[in-house]
Amino acid sequence: MKRVRVKVIFVSFGLLVVFLSLSGTAADCPSSWSSYEGHCYKPFNEGKNWADAENFCTQQHTGGHLVSFHSTEEADFVVKLAFQTFGHSIFWIGLSNVWNKCSWQWSNGAMLKYEDWAEESYCVYFKSTNNKWRSRACRMLARFVCEFQA
C-alpha cells in the first residue's frame, strides 16, 4: 500500500512538472497571437497608413507596437507568420523617419543649417518576396504586424 502511494505521488509530481513547463511556452500570448523568444506577434490583413497601424498596435496590448526585428531568425519567424495570414505582400514594421531626424550633411562637408523639407515622412515596410526593407511615404496603406513583449 505504501509503494502504491509513493508511485502515485511520484507520477503526480512528474505530471505537474510537465504541465507547468508546457504552460509557460505559448500561454504567455493571448489567443490568436504567436510566441517567439518572449514576444507575441500578430499579423493584420487590413491596410492602414504607418501612424494608424502603430496606433492600432498600441491599442491591442500594453507595450504593443509595430514589429521590430533584432535578428534574422526573428525576421524569418515573422515572415512565415505573415505569409500564413496574407501571403507574399508588403507590411509595415516599426521603423520610420517620422520626425525627419536623419543626420544629413552636404557633400562638401558643411553642416546642414538651412532646411526646406517637404512634409512627407518616410516609414519602412518589409517586402516578403525578397525579405528586404524599403521605405515609402508613411501615408500609404499597407498590412502590418504588431508585437509586444510577453
Swiss-Prot record:
Protein transport among keywords: no
Domain annotation C-type lectin: ranges: 36-147
SUPFAM superfamilies in alphabetical order: C-type lectin-like
Broad class of the protein's primary localization: secreted
One Pfam family from the record: Lectin_C
Gene3D superfamilies to which the protein is assigned, alphabetical: Mannose-Binding Protein A, subunit A (3.10.100.10)
Keywords tagged on the record: Disulfide bond, Hemostasis impairing toxin, Metal-binding, Secreted, Signal, Toxin
UniProt subcellular location: Secreted
Listed PROSITE patterns: C_TYPE_LECTIN_1 (PS00615), C_TYPE_LECTIN_2 (PS50041)
PANTHER family per UniProt: MANNOSE, PHOSPHOLIPASE, LECTIN RECEPTOR RELATED
Subunit structure: Heteromultimer; disulfide-linked.
Annotated function: Interferes with one step of hemostasis (modulation of platelet aggregation, or coagulation cascade, for example).
Protein name per its UniProtKB record: C-type lectin 16
Annotated organism of origin: Crotalus adamanteus
